[in-house]
Curated annotation (Swiss-Prot):
<feature type="compositionally biased region" description="Polar residues">
    <location>
        <begin position="409"/>
        <end position="420"/>
    </location>
</feature>
<dbReference type="InterPro" id="IPR038952">
    <property type="entry name" value="TOPAZ1"/>
</dbReference>
<dbReference type="GO" id="GO:0006915">
    <property type="term" value="P:apoptotic process"/>
</dbReference>
<feature type="compositionally biased region" description="Basic and acidic residues">
    <location>
        <begin position="429"/>
        <end position="439"/>
    </location>
</feature>
<protein>
    <recommendedName>
        <fullName>Protein TOPAZ1</fullName>
    </recommendedName>
</protein>
<dbReference type="Pfam" id="PF14669">
    <property type="entry name" value="Asp_Glu_race_2"/>
</dbReference>
<feature type="region of interest" description="Disordered">
    <location>
        <begin position="407"/>
        <end position="439"/>
    </location>
</feature>
<keyword id="KW-0221">Differentiation</keyword>
<feature type="compositionally biased region" description="Basic and acidic residues">
    <location>
        <begin position="853"/>
        <end position="863"/>
    </location>
</feature>
<dbReference type="GO" id="GO:0140742">
    <property type="term" value="P:lncRNA transcription"/>
</dbReference>
<dbReference type="InterPro" id="IPR029435">
    <property type="entry name" value="TOPAZ1_dom"/>
</dbReference>
<keyword id="KW-0744">Spermatogenesis</keyword>
<feature type="region of interest" description="Disordered">
    <location>
        <begin position="1"/>
        <end position="90"/>
    </location>
</feature>
<feature type="region of interest" description="Disordered">
    <location>
        <begin position="850"/>
        <end position="877"/>
    </location>
</feature>
<feature type="compositionally biased region" description="Pro residues">
    <location>
        <begin position="1"/>
        <end position="11"/>
    </location>
</feature>
<feature type="compositionally biased region" description="Basic and acidic residues">
    <location>
        <begin position="63"/>
        <end position="74"/>
    </location>
</feature>
<keyword id="KW-0963">Cytoplasm</keyword>
Length: 1646
């Protein structure tokens, strides 16, 4: 099927035809007559010259209107029926009529305010230029086509006018709302006439949203009549308002409050009218059948009914008045625009358009299919109408009475509105005036009514008409400065129009947020326009393509495509954007050398989700991906040349995101607008939570670096709802020749673009370097002329270099075969992956989901490429995605090339941070850019540097990205190099956006460059889709294993894949555990062999994490460490090199000397001055660790430091180390020879210079490589130190020698060991000679140096094989002989009193010697009353510790009894009790008298537990007569020699033994007798002794607790006293003490 050569005749939908249909049928023109609309030119109210020019321009406009009306009559049809206006108001009114009226109301005040701000003096000169420009224009004016609701809209507008006339605030201006509206467009939108004429000649419609104007003729007449007062108002009020500008700003809030009530009343009227329209729309749109082929106009008007929301009719009335304003007052001149821009720049610093989001110049017309499917709907149509009307009326009411905001509203709404009218007509024969914007190209023309059927989207390649490919060219201009408004002429006007953007779906914006954002955006627009920098900055999401000519020869045209900064939630704008992309990709083929680069910035994720929902039907049929799809993706499909493989995206298994609806187009067969409305209900709420800025690239080239207007950014601006500002302002030059079409994928053309921006004498170099574009476009190389313009008193200069761009020939085939899609609309094979394995659009969209979510607090460019000095592009631990065109894409950023082509950079290494965000006000903050740029080194996430290389991607086994840039890298001295952070992050999005927000810790770099030839992908912030994508699609593609054998507990993605683990919280191990050092080595070897930058990053991370926790083991390989360091250096990872080297030095793993030299070479080559201090520190650590570089190495290091421009202090540090090493080297030269060293020892001995001998020891230790030779030297030293006995010298040689050695900085444990062994030899030597004092001095110095010699052996003589016991005995004996018992005990304690053990065997003689030595020590200590030390020595006698050494135990009994007696005498009951226990335990004979004395002393001291224990021990040893025979006979025999304590203990045993009988019921009849036995000793005892014993017995009964009572009974035959124990006291005692007494006396522990 061939596309129609001319667009089908638009017709209105059945049942919705209005007065417009009648007008069309009778062939009447829809626009008012010149006499009606241009009435302002009939009466001369100003100067005569001005009136004459006005009349002339009105006549031209009138002629244009008539001509185009005739043309329009030829191509349009009118329905037969023509209802009278007002007869069918409820049924035929538009869906959002009330909102349209509010929009008109808003635009009126905006227009009036701006008109009054124009300077009177600028009118004359502007009129002259205007006349000249008008002569070049077509005399045709676009006809206004009225399709519906004329009468209703007219009535509503007039009623709205009445409301405004009653407003006291505006009565002073004597202007009705209609007049104000006309004035607003007269003042600055005269530029529409230019673009309008050109577009009409070319048969294009110059409307961003593809919607035609609709207005009622009568309403237009009434409005244009009021224009006659405009000229007078202009001249008289301009100066007044300019003077009172600041006062108006200050009174803004007051005015807002005063008119709030009246505003709400106006909004209520609109709300009621919208309610009436709701049901009529639903009634008219039901029951319609889908027709496969329909006329273009029929589809358009039905598409309006389908999904057109409040914005549609809102735009109708606005553009009606816009058109009238342009016709009625054509005499406004070019100077108006200049003054307008100047005034606007000043005003936008403070305020914003109050209802800019409501003034949407969208109309119902030919290309309204863009709105038919993508307007953001509410959950139900009814709720949408109510909410829209309410919010619009409230917002309007709150803001309409702020006169200051009139000025600001012009920047984003009214100025742009004329570009919305694109009537169809014949192309103009004048080729030099073909100046239509990219978005004006005709796109899809098929619209389906609201019947639930599919709707062809705007950018469907199946519905492109032949006219859409017609090209126009910009006229050759000879102006020297395109930034000068006086020379820009029509193209500057066109850019001015299209720079303005729309904001549909106004209720999504909070007023405060909108004010801030629109203020910033409006300011950016006109500042950048004056500086010849194409800039787009606004909250509105409509993509506008701006063309601005920059003269560069007669044949040169510079088109400046600017893209809207962001995309707000509205899906309607997304369709327009994608439509513009399609038009640019296909429509520019015939344009001579001109191709605008489209730049599309994708909104936050929530906005994307909403847009995806609205585009469900679009993606199903038009084979276009979601909003994340950019033009290169479409180009990739076109370049393949295989339309049979043209895929429609499909994302199945959605995991819950409503925003992914558009990718599931195959799940449902019918998508009616009501269904879309329902599906989008959940997404609407998310539109208010847009917190992310995701900048992507759209258009023929997906990767471009643009000149950026410096701005200031604030982090909080990213929380604004639906507020996104374009951070890029671009200008590109194209040749005036036909594009070279290149079909093969991968063909890249390199071009350079350098940008130098000078701001207030601060020159910043923004080096945009080399850039290889995709094979889709190929352009002739052309250099831009420098552009200079003044912005708020500041000069900005831009030097843009040449660009190359190519188009493939496949566009021709694409244009011819656009209707092939029509027959495969429902083909299920279109969804999925092709047979060749190429990813379809669905999988391509899914590929985006692999990328992690960007932190919501910070904006980020989706495509960043970081660079460190080197040939390869360094990777960083942050995730990055390379945006690739279908071909191999290479973008290199090099130092900016001036006229001399020499690299230049900030001498301080400060990189400029070029940013533009929502709240950026460029003019106010240009002076702060210098500080901001320097702060960006540490604060920004993306830092621009002097050179960056984005390498082209190659697919290999390991997905290694190799850099093809073989050029030398410029040295950059910024701190980024020293810190080794990302030296350059170049956004591959159109703006060179360098965000100043670096708060988040960056996640590890785990993303790859995509394989060449695949479609470019963008970041999709959806981790759920990411998981699905990994699971189903490309897990194997992107995660190829490296072939490592990894244990199960380790993360295989982290260790065994190139990209690493992407899990947010991985349950597997990412760092090897202790004992898995072999795994570390294997991983390092593999990563080194692969030699990929990210793997080397990972290897450094694993090395640092592992060896910070665990010391190196047997599997550690020094060669692997060296190889790792070399690989890191090759990839310019200096930070990781420093970290690994420092850790290796701390862990005693010294890398090779060549590694250190290579580091110095790298730092010197890159001139990294800031890295020198850290490198010097590492060098010193190397020297301290024992590395001795050669003198030539040191000289080379000094040379490299000079090359790196190191300071003199740093170089001096190396020279000092060199001098020290030279001294050591000299010593090494003569000490490495062992013979010469030994001879030197003899010399020291002869001279008695033991200090020199110590220094010689240190030198030998540092220079000797063989430890055996060093031990031989130490033995020689030991012999030398022990052969000076012949000479009578007071000092001890060993002491001087040991002190010298201990002062060495390298003094270590090895030195302690050697000194201890030499000291043992000296001790033995003095022990043999009985030189106790000298021997003790040796022992003292060993004690001071904390050398544990007791575990060592000597170096020479018998002490070399002496057992440990012998060495300890010798040392202890020396201490004893020298009178130091403490020293002797210290030596014994140091040896842990060990004699002979399996580990330290010794002879019996040594054991006996130890026993005698200890006994001697105990005897001496006991004499000093040191009982504790004596007992410690005695209990460590040989034999007590080891039973095998049981010898001479009886010999030690005397010492123990002496110690026990001495302790009792001194009342040391604790030690005496311990001694008694030890003697009983070790069966050492104990003197009973000492034991009885101990028991008595313990009892008298109330230590009853110990007394009872020792009493039981004494009973068992036989110290007391046995009691068993008499106890149970109720008779107790008590010897008279016992003490009262012993008697009481005996009575206790007696009571416990007879407790059962005593406590029995018949016990009172029994008698317990105690007999005080006389002693049967040879020594006769006197009467007094026995009498004392009787008293002790009575005392024993009394001291018991409770007391016992005894009675004297009789005297037996042996004259022994017999006593009876009172029964009651015995019972009482048992009752209280039986528990513990039974345990103590009835149960023995022996």
């Amino acid at each position: 099927m061939r596309p129609p050569t001319t667009p089908p005749v638009p017709t209105t939908a059945p049942g919705r035809q209005g007065a417009t249909g009648g007008l069309r049928k009778r062939g009447l023109r829809l626009t008012p007559e010149p006499g009606e609309g241009g009435g302002c030119s009939l009466e001369a109210r100003g100067r005569e010259e001005e009136s004459r020019q006005k009349r002339r321009m009105v006549a031209q406009a009138s002629g244009r209107e008539e001509t185009e009306a005739k043309e329009n009559g030829k191509v349009t049809e009118a329905p037969s029926d023509e209802p009278q206006p007002g007869t069918d108001l409820v049924r035929k009114t538009s869906i959002t009529n009330s909102e349209s009226l509010q929009t008109v109301e808003c635009s009126e005040f905006q227009s009036m305010a701006f008109l009054q701000s124009l300077a009177k003096e600028e009118l004359v000169e502007g009129i002259k230029r205007r006349i000249q420009i008008k002569k070049c224009k077509s005399s045709e004016n676009p006809p206004l086509k009225i399709t519906k609701n004329e009468a209703t809209q007219n009535i509503m507008v007039e009623s709205q006018d009445e409301l405004f006339k009653n407003t006291p605030k505006y009565s002073c201006n004597s202007l009705s709302p209609g007049v104000e509206k006309n004035c607003s467009f007269e003042s600055h939108d005269f530029s529409f006439l230019h673009s309008e004429g050109c577009n009409n000649k070319n048969g294009f419609e110059d409307e961003p949203h593809g919607v035609c104007l609709h207005a009622e003729e009568n309403s237009l007449k009434s409005k244009k009549e009021n224009l006659r007062n405009l000229a007078e108002k202009d001249d008289t009020k301009t100066t007044k308002f300019l003077k009172t500008e600041k006062n108006v700003i200050a009174s803004k809030l007051l005015l807002e409050e005063s008119h709030l009530y009246q505003n709400k009343n106006n909004g209520l009227t609109s709300c009621l009218q919208s309610e009436k329209n709701k049901y009529s729309v639903e009634e008219n749109n039901t029951g319609r059948k889908h027709r496969k082929k329909m006329k273009l106009s029929e589809k358009e008007e039905k598409g309006i009914d389908l999904t057109l929301s409040n914005v549609c009719n809102n735009s109708e009335l606005v553009l009606q008045e816009h058109q009238i304003g342009m016709e009625g007052k054509e005499t406004e001149t070019l100077e108006h625009k200049k003054s307008f821009l100047k005034a606007l720049r000043k005003m936008n610093h403070n305020t914003l358009p109050p209802v800019d989001h409501l003034c949407l110049p969208e109309t119902v017309g030919k290309t309204s299919c863009r709105h038919s499917t993508n307007v953001v709907l509410q959950k139900t149509l009814e709720s949408s109408l109510k909410e829209d009307t309410k919010n619009a009326s409230e917002t309007l009411g709150c803001r309409r009475l702020q006169p200051e905001e009139y000025f600001k509203s012009m920047t984003s709404s009214t100025v742009k509105s004329p570009s919305d009218s694109h009537p169809m007509g014949k192309r103009s024969p004048r080729g030099d005036l073909k100046t239509d914007t990219e978005e004006s190209k005709v796109s899809c023309r098929r619209i389906i009514p609201m019947t639930g059927k599919r709707v062809w989207p705007l950018y469907s390649c199946a519905r492109i008409t032949a006219e859409c490919w017609k090209k126009t060219s910009l006229s050759d201009l000879n102006d020297s400065l395109p930034g000068s408004l006086g020379n820009v002429r029509q193209h500057d006007f066109l850019m001015h129009q299209t720079n303005q953007t729309h904001l549909p779906d106004s209720k999504r914006l909070q007023p405060s947020l909108i004010e801030r954002t629109i203020e910033s955006s409006s300011k950016e627009v006109y500042d950048s326009e004056l500086s010849s920098l194409s800039s787009v900055s606004s909250v509105e999401p409509t993509l506008l393509d701006i063309k601005e000519t920059i003269p560069h020869d007669k044949k040169t045209k510079l088109e400046e495509p600017s893209r809207n900064g962001t995309e707000v939630v509205s899906s309607a704008t997304e369709d327009i954007q994608l439509s513009n992309i399609t038009q640019i990709l296909t429509g520019n083929k015939k344009k001579k050398g001109n191709l605008s680069k489209l730049n599309l910035t994708v909104a936050p994720q929530e906005s994307q989700e909403a847009n995806n929902c609205a585009n469900k039907t679009v993606h199903r049929k038009a084979c276009i991906t979601k909003q994340t799809l950019v033009a290169p993706d479409l180009v990739k499909i076109l370049n393949t040349g295989r339309l049979t493989n043209f895929k429609i995206p499909l994302l199945k298994n959605k995991t819950g995101k409503r925003g992914e609806v558009s990718a599931r187009s195959s799940e449902r067969e019918a998508y009616s607008p009501l269904e879309l409305l329902d599906s989008l209900s959940g997404v609407e709420a998310k539109q208010n939570r847009n917190k992310e800025n995701i900048c992507t690239t759209s258009g023929p080239q997906s990767l471009n670096i643009h000149s950026v207007t410096p701005g200031q950014t604030s982090s909080h601006t990213f929380y604004n709802k639906n507020s996104c500002t374009s951070p890029s302002f671009t200008k590109k030059g194209y040749d005036n020749k036909t594009c070279n079409h290149i079909s093969e994928t991968g063909n890249t053309i390199s071009n350079k673009e350098s940008l130098s921006i000078k701001i207030e004498n601060n020159t910043f170099s923004c080096d945009l370097g080399y850039m290889e574009q995709s094979s889709f476009c190929s352009k002739k190389q052309e250099a831009f002329v420098p552009i200079s313009s003044e912005i708020s008193g500041r000069k900005m200069t831009k030097s843009i270099s040449e660009l190359k761009l190519g188009f493939p020939d496949i566009l021709k085939a694409y244009e011819d075969d656009v209707l092939l899609i029509d027959v495969i609309q429902d083909d299920p094979e279109l969804f999925g992956i092709s047979s060749e394995g190429d990813l379809s659009f669905a999988s391509e969209v899914s590929k985006i989901s692999q990328e992690p979510r960007v932190s919501e607090e910070h904006p980020s460019a989706d495509f960043k490429h970081r660079h460190l000095p080197g040939k390869k592009e360094p990777g960083d631990l942050s995730k990055e995605v390379a945006l690739l065109d279908p071909g191999l894409l290479k973008l290199e950023i090099c130092p900016s090339l001036s006229a001399a082509k020499e690299p230049q950079h900030d001498p301080k290494g400060a990189a400029i941070s070029l940013e533009a965000t929502e709240e950026t006000v460029i003019s106010e903050n240009l002076e702060d850019l210098s500080e901001q740029a320097r702060a960006s080194d540490s604060d920004t996430k993306c830092v621009s540097s002097d050179k960056a290389t984005v390498v082209e991607e190659q697919e290999n086994t390991h997905e290694v990205c190799k850099s093809k840039d073989s050029r030398s890298v410029e040295a950059v001295s910024t701190e980024c190099h020293l810190a080794l952070g990302p030296n350059t992050l170049c956004s591959s999005a159109p703006p060179l956006t360098l965000s100043s927000h670096q708060d988040v810790a960056p996640a590890p770099w785990t993303n790859d460059f995509r394989f060449p030839g695949r479609y470019s992908v963008l970041q999709l912030q959806n981790p759920e889709t990411c998981e699905i994508f990994k699971r189903e699609k490309n897990f194997g593609v992107f995660q190829k294993p490296l072939g490592l054998m990894i244990p199960h507990r380790y993360c295989k993605l982290h260790f065994n894949t190139l990209r690493g683990c992407e899990r947010a919280q991985c349950k597997f191990v990412h760092v090897p555990e202790q004992g898995d050092e072999k795994i570390c080595m294997d991983v390092f070897k593999k990563y080194i062999r692969v030699n990929e930058q990210r793997l080397l990053h990972r290897a450094a991370y694993i090395f640092l994490e592992y060896y910070r926790k665990f010391p190196p083991g047997i599997h550690f390989s020094l060669q692997v460490l060296n190889d790792l360091l070399i690989s890191l250096l090759k990839h310019c990872l200096l930070k990781e090199v420093f970290q690994v080297v420092q850790l290796s030095i701390m862990a005693k793993m010294l890398p090779a000397l060549k590694i250190l030299l290579k580091i110095f070479e790298y730092v010197a080559a890159m001139k990294l001055r800031n890295a020198v201090p850290a490198l010097i520190e590492i060098f010193c650590k190397f020297i301290e660790a024992g590395m001795i570089p050669d003198p030539e190495h040191l000289n080379y290091i000094v040379k490299l430091l000079h090359q790196a421009q190191a300071s003199q202090q740093e170089i001096s540090a190396v020279l000092e180390a060199k001098s020290r090493l030279q001294v050591r080297q000299l010593r090494k030269n003569w000490t490495c020879d062992l013979d010469s060293a030994l001879s030197e020892v003899e010399n020291c001995k002869e001279k008695g210079d033991w200090t020199k001998l110590g220094n010689l020891y240190i030198s030998i230790k540092m220079g000797c490589e063989e430890f055996a030779d060093f031990q031989r030297f130490c033995a020689c030293v030991a012999e030398t130190l022990t052969e000076d006995y012949k000479e009578e010298r007071p000092g001890v040689p060993f002491c001087e020698f040991a002190e010298t050695v201990s002062k060495d900085p390298q003094y270590s444990e090895v030195d302690k060991t050697l000194l201890g062994r030499i000291g043992i030899s000296a001790v033995y030597f003095y022990h043999r000679l009985l030189l106790w004092s000298k021997g003790r001095k040796v022992l003292d110095i060993l004690y001071e140096l904390k050398i544990h010699f007791t575990s060592l052996k000597g170096l020479t003589g018998p002490e070399k094989i002496a057992p440990r016991c012998q060495i300890v005995n010798v040392a202890a004996e020396i201490f004893i002989k020298s009178g130091s018992l403490d020293g002797a005990i210290w030596v014994l304690r140091e040896s842990e009193w060990i004699t002979s053990t399996p580990l330290w065997p010794c002879d019996r003689a040594d054991v006996l010697h130890r026993h005698n030595l200890l006994c001697a020590i105990a005897h001496e200590i006991l004499g000093k009353n040191l009982y504790k030390q004596t007992f410690e020595v005695l209990r460590n006698l040989p034999g007590f510790q080891n039973s095998q050494e049981a010898m001479g135990v009886s010999q030690s009994s005397l010492l123990f009894n002496e110690l026990l007696d001495a302790c009792i005498e001194s009342n040391s009951l604790g030690i005496s009790s311990s001694v008694a226990d030890f003697m009983v335990a070790k069966s050492i004979p104990i003197d009973f008298s000492f034991l009885r004395r101990l028991i008595t002393s313990l009892g008298r001291s109330c230590l009853w537990l110990k007394a009872r224990a020792h009493y039981k021990s004494a009973l068992s040893l036989g110290c007391y007569p046995p009691l068993e025979g008499n106890v149970y006979r109720k008779l107790l025999l008590v010897p008279s020699y016992l003490s009262e304590i012993e008697m009481l203990l005996a009575i206790e045993i007696f009571l416990v033994s007879n407790a059962s009988s005593i406590q029995s019921p018949g016990a009172p009849t029994q008698v317990l007798q105690i007999v005080l036995k006389r002693c049967e000793e040879s020594k006769p005892r006197s009467k007094d002794d026995y009498q004392a014993a009787v008293e002790r017995l009575i005392m024993a009964a009394r001291i018991s607790d409770p007391k016992l009572f005894i009675k004297h009974m009789t005297v037996n035959i042996n004259k022994e006293q017999v006593y009876s124990l009172e029964h009651c006291s015995a019972v009482k005692w048992l009752k209280e003490n039986m528990k513990w007494a039974g345990k103590v006396w009835l149960f023995t522990n022996h």
